[in-house]
Amino acid sequence: MNYLNDEHYPDYTAWQAIINVEREFKPKGFRPIVFICSPYAGDVKANAANARSYCRFAVKMGYIPMAPHLLFPQFLHDKKLAERNLGMYMGLVMMSKCHEVWVFGDTITKGMSMEIAKAKYKGKKIRYFKAIMEADYDEA
């Protein structure tokens, strides 16, 4: 972008205005990764739908969500203790790569409390959200 006008004189005001407009339409470069901590076991269908809503909320807020409880049940069996423990371990490893931990919901499950304890131990910033932040997630 050239800061000179048509007559080749410097026109910094117009140049800066154009730069500002271009910035508005470009996606933000840096998006911190956040670990999504929410219930999964119990009502798995409803809890997974809620977790997807929480992830969508994180994206709208400018973050990259990481929700291992949406990924690992795709190939690990939550009902088998060894595989559940492996999934929890891998989730904690993924948490170490995250900038913050976001805790959603009114209930703190046993798995969530383990994740929160690990986040505190690692010195991660923990944010608590009580209500569902996103209700327009389309399942289709």
Short names for language-model regions:
Residues 1-140:
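Catalytic phosphate/metal-binding cores of nucleic-acid and nucleotide-processing enzymes, i.e., regions
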